[in-house]
């Protein structure tokens, strides 16, 4: 009786794609017609019993070379034809591991032992041949010197055998499973044909396929030996009992070429992949490519048709001892979908309303956007959105009161919309158009002052604005330089000199720029502006003041000084501690100077560590607090908190000192002179009074910035600067007044802060500002005490600084708050300011004539240029109030014809009454 498979069985199994390894290997054994004739009569067994009654004559004893046969590293596998019409089916012609020639007596004993097992019918899962097919080459090298009578024991040793029966329990939980050392499925060359024998069972596989859902569950390490033995003897009828339809791909049976091994499935099923599936998507399926054909376990896995854009990227298999991580697994085919573009980053989305002509855009965005529209068309859409989503804003009561005051003083005259024709209309300086009943008048010397301002309107191209200064400061350090200045006696008198400096020139990593060296030469003179009148004294009241150094490029350095009398006995000369910084924050640096004074009284050596800790501190943002730690003898480690106010515009401003020195009407006249960039000189007896009043007046110009010479305290030795024909704002001590009277000075406004009077004036300061707006501003400032008393009952946050700031901001909103309606956008995306439509949009002639003068100043040019160059909206206090002001402007104004008809109607009513 032939124990091999018949030709018909071979053809049947060649078309069968079994769902388990037993059928798979049985099919492969039956098709092997490329093996020798003797191999056909060998029962190819993977632990499956085909014919237990066949006698097995002894084999020839193999040679030592055959006995030491080893598995080759690479297996050459040929692909079979995919057609079903081929007779024998594709065979494996690759080199199989050579048989090692076991002793026939030992083999026969083992065969009889296996034949004694009863045939047990088990399910598909139990009939799986055990063991995977990966092993190390190391055990093969260790059997060279062993006697030929122990090969069976060696074969069973990796399975923890105790003698007769192989113990396969260890295979259930091990990673690397050792294969039998002798391959019995290959006939060595020259071996005689003989009766077939039953070979040793292969180790049981330690994994299940994903398609086998009804198999026996995975057993633990301590499974009993009977269960393991029952797997080794299986009814051969099960090999062909299940013949499912062959799996096809693309209408053809899949070939065997270019297929990867089952290593993917080993890893995928042995490691719990549920967590990976959840990460890659519930419906993503398996992330590893596994076989869809089960013809041969030694075939390479072929990939299905690639349906993703990454088809050229090969998938690398993972070693058996490594578990693939979720983020390295390739996504499944179902996971690939049409990619969606990411959302547009916020910094690419224009927050202003440029080039936006969709009314729906404004209706959806206007409630969140506090920037200003930039064109007239956009403003109309902006208004439509506001009407659709009209909500009453919760303005502070102080702001509402200020707005009511201006509206009551201004009357019905508001800004009207001027259509843009595409050409800049010539400026008509002497126009008298407007409401004939307007009681406003034109000052006599307006045209004369305009002629004087025009030649000097573009003297400095380096425009500076407050917003730009604040942005540049964010990348600076807290201060640039700290010096201690003292007076040194010389034959001509006392001369100020620097006696201590930090950082010093010798400090490592400190490189002093040329600009710093030039400014360092003049700093001592600003620290002691009255050095000629100084003398040793027993007592001196310390005072704090500041000065400003303006560079050729328009940059400014603030000097914060503290003048005091050093410790000692007898008459002593005063000293000045000076900190130079780009940040304008008077209160913050005053606190630092107080700490310096405390340490210098103990020892001058304590100043350096403290100043170094301050310089290394981060630059504080508005409203933020930084902590500086330092050591103080007797007190230990100290922490000093330095805080910047939230409103950075007013952090170096003291309006109380200003109102103590000047009345409201004098203050308005000084501000009007500065708006037209005239020359102004403050005179006072105290250094602190000069610096505080000077900073306060400059702060009232917001949102504009003084662009010219600004020296809060001018040294006597530099008094010649007042002869300059350019605009300036300078403060001098009263002791320098005699020197000032001897100098040839052009038109200048000299203000005595101590006496609250004008020493010299142009005599037209009251006629500069529009009278109605000026009256509203004066009323608010004069009633400041009453307003503050009422507002502080409801909110403690209302201060004098906030009241003065809001009043002046409202004044400028009435004048130029509609500037954004006259910004046009060119084809290149550049903003261009339309000057003439901007000026003509005011219905008041006094406002238009003031704008004739003010629009020629460098302050206004810097303001416009800053708005033209900015790509994002400016969100300062002025912009917020201007937006609220634009909401109150009516959408349409009566045309010129309507005004004529309305005036005729009023005249007819007047005649009818007569």
From Swiss-Prot:
Molecular function as annotated in GO: guanyl-nucleotide exchange factor activity
Q: Which domain of life is it from?
A: Eukaryota
Q: Where does the record place the modification Phosphoserine?
A: 261
Arranged from A to Z, the UniProt key words for this protein are:
Guanine-nucleotide releasing factor, Phosphoprotein
* Domain dDENN, chain residue ranges per copy: 784-874
What is the name listed in the Swiss-Prot or TrEMBL entry for this protein? DENN domain-containing protein 2C
**Which stretches does the entry tag as region Disordered?**
46-98, 411-446
Role description: Guanine nucleotide exchange factor (GEF) which may activate RAB9A and RAB9B. Promotes the exchange of GDP to GTP, converting inactive GDP-bound Rab proteins into their active GTP-bound form.
> What InterPro entries does this protein map onto?
cDENN_dom, dDENN_dom, DENN_C, DENN_domain_containing_2, Tripartite_DENN, uDENN_dom
Domain (cDENN) ranges? 649-782
Tell me what organism the protein belongs to. Answer: Mus musculus
Q: Which residues form the uDENN domain?
A: 480-627
Q: Which gene underlies this protein?
A: Dennd2c
* Comp. bias (Basic and acidic residues): 56-68
